[in-house]
Amino acid sequence: MAYRKRGARREANLNNNDRMQEKNDEKQDSNKIQLSDKVLSKKEEIVTDSHEEVKITDEVKKSTKEESKQLLEVLKTKEEHQKEIQYEILQKTIPTFEPKETILKKLEDIKPELAKKQTKLFRIFEPKQLPIYRANGERELRNRWCWKLKKDTLPDGDYDVREYFLNLYDQVLTEMPDYLLLKDMAVENKNSRDAGKVVDSETASICDAIFQDEETEGAVRRFIAEMRQRVQADRNVVNYPSILHPIDYAFNEYFLQHQLVEPLNNDIIFNYIPERIRNDVNYILNMDRNLPSTARYIRPNLLQDRLNLHDNFESLWDTITTSNYILARSIVPDLKELVSTEAQIQKMSQDLQLEALTIQSETQFLTGINSQAANDCFKTLIAAMLSQRTMSLDFVTTNYMSLISGMWLLTVIPNDMFIRESLVACQLAIVNTIIYPAFGMQRMHYRNGDPQTPFQIAEQQIQNFQVANWLHFVNNNQFRQAVIDGVLNQVLNDNIRSGHVINQLMEALMQLSRQQFPTMPVDYKRSIQRGILLLSNRLGQLVDLTRLLAYNYETLMACITMNMQHVQTLTTEKLQLTSVTSLCMLIGNATVIPSPQTLFHYYNVNVNFHSNYNERINDAVAIITAANRLNLYQKKMKAIVEDFLKRLYIFDVSRVPDDQMYRLRDRLRLLPVEIRRLDIFNLILMNMDQIERASDKIAQGVIIAYRDMHLERDEMYGYVNIARNLDGFQQINLEELMRSGDYAQITNMLLNNQPVALVGALPFITDSSVISLIAKLDATVFAQIVKLRKVDTLKPILYKINSDSNDFYLVANYDWVPTSTTKVYKQVPQQFDFRNSMHMLTSNLTFTVYSDLLAFVSADTVEPINAVAFDNMRIMNEL
């Protein structure tokens, strides 16, 4: 504010002075009203006088500016200091946890594989009618049936064909059913005399087409009329007739023989419930004993730690633990009947005698205390331990109550659960604020990177037995690893589970409050003592809280199916010590335990994720092995790993670092292939030629000659340049030729007038116009290819001259015999033989597959007040 120069307007009249006085009074009143607002507001305002005729010298201006600068600096320093000190005072509400609904939904939407119902048989082939041509190229009236590919997408090029077979294998793995019930897919045979059924709609349509074909023998027609199912009710078995290519039959017969369904009975359901929940006296379980004999289930695949994602997969492990944390947060029960926040704060104020005090540090004890924060803290602690998520502590050193609450936290939660830096900071604050001042010891100067924590150093220096004993317990507070039901569990110390450790903590706190704090002022000592008093007044409730925390953690832990590996996570869950204070101060005497429905839901979600995880590992391992055995040297393994992660649903694959992707690939390579997947691959591998020859898209090679060769008659095409075998020709593998780039051998053979056969998958191109074929000299095409050494552009021309060609009669009339310097090598497709294609498939007549085994269990709990912990004493004893 600018200063007025004294005596500047003494000659002004009295009336004017009176008016000025009134204005000043009004200004002061308004200033008083706005003062509180201005102090609390964060806006920086420049306060100036009203515009009056006041003369100010340059010197006064300079001095005013300097004073203003100094004042601003003081205010800024004070403001920053206040921000630091009053952080928790100003923060009246603590941010609550917002569950990521998308991740939770992704986890809960993972269902067992049996949700995929098989409605038809697996088929690669289908029979098709092909024309027959006479010796002169004319088409006959009769047709022949041959097996062709249902979905003919075979590419050209040996490598691409092998890649096609890998994709086919992937498709089979995707469609491979866990169980087959033929009765569900059977359809009526239209040509049956007694309304019999065949196995599926495609078999029925094939039978219909063959029955209507004029070429079909009478015996075959009579057989089709007799085709029907054969039921053996006493054995719960039914046989259905089917028409399948031998390879398709091999696939479907394998699926039928290797179904994953197993008989379901009450013992299986009983053993499916986690043992600790079965044996927990707080849960009353009843089972429906009316299971039919046809009940079936699919045993979940719960193999452990095949990839060890906790080891060197930081990003993946962080995502898994985050998902588990979000799931656990959603099922931890809410605290009930907490102490009224207002009543508790009022009582604490009375204990602190705040009316008679103006010590700011003690008013901080009450900040941030609310029931929402208490509930939030309870859920965070249990969920973090269940998911093994690392926590970080948020606190202000000047709030002694937070630090005293932190002492309870460090007593009951193992050190491993906190990130090292946060644990050290909290322990150092407790040591330098409470423990060392109590005994008059100098501040601990902690060196960053010291292998020992502040509590470990303090344990060696403190002479007081009770305090040193408590420090020793905290320093050695680690999870105990135990394998229960085949799952690695992180178990709490028995002293924590029973709540006895709280007495140890209270003894240490009482010893600290009795100390003299010789180097500190009286107010400081009194503040610490009153903070300890507030906590010690709730000894019974703290014991109960510790028992309640341990019971809920262990009960929910029984529903975890994957090993609880403990590794520090990349990201942490923040925990504010004011929320710990809220929990300690507001916990009531109402027991909360998870409801049976919540437990079963948590267990089912864990089982489904774990089972899906193992099945996707099996798929990825099978695909990687298949790619290696098919010699797919260009195949990017990273793509297989990415696909594997996508099928687990919870990962953002694009954000996973490459080094972890390749490490994952290496781990997947070391795993053995699951037996069913291996057998299926061997079926494909043994029948690659059969599948390839059924394609109309590709030929198996080409014969190149220097001189023209006559076109030959073929029943399937007429006059064509097709060779049905390679006898008498020297063979060269086309893929190896293209990879080596050495074409000298071909050139020399052609110049010596020796035809050469290039063996490999080539496009099977047809052009029916003879005129256009004559215009294309394939000899010059191939000469150019050999000359330029671009065999990968090889596209042999198929001459096909028959009565379907536009120029058939032109050729016939002039008695012209066409020739070609190339012959396309094409294997003969397999002919359809009804007798060899008719197979009987056998399955159970009927059974019911149950996906949710726990639906048979009706469960209830005892009254929460009567709930007991592992020591057969009530969880909450304080009433």
Curated annotation (Swiss-Prot):
Q: Where are the transmembrane segments?
A: none
Q: What the record says about its domains?
A: The N-terminus binds RNA. It is necessary for encapsidation of VP1 and VP3. The N-termini of 10 VP2 molecules form a cylindrical hub underneath each 5-fold axis of the inner capsid.
Superkingdom to which the source organism belongs: Viruses
What's this chain's function? Inner capsid protein that self-assembles to form an icosahedral capsid with a T=2 symmetry, which consists of 120 copies of VP2, with channels at each of its five-fold vertices. This capsid constitutes the innermost concentric layer of the viral mature particle. It encapsidates the polymerase VP1, the capping enzyme VP3 and the genomic dsRNA, thereby defining the core.
Organism expressing this protein natively: Rotavirus A (strain RVA/Human/United States/DS-1/1976/G2P1B[4]) (RV-A)
- What residue spans carry the region label Disordered? 1-35
Describe its PTM? Sumoylated with SUMO1 and SUMO2. Sumoylation of viral proteins seems to have a positive role on viral replication.
- State the residue spans of region: 5-fold hub: 1-79
Q: Which UniProt keywords apply?
A: Capsid protein, Inner capsid protein, Repeat, RNA-binding, T=2 icosahedral capsid protein, Ubl conjugation, Virion
Q: What name goes with this protein?
A: Inner capsid protein VP2
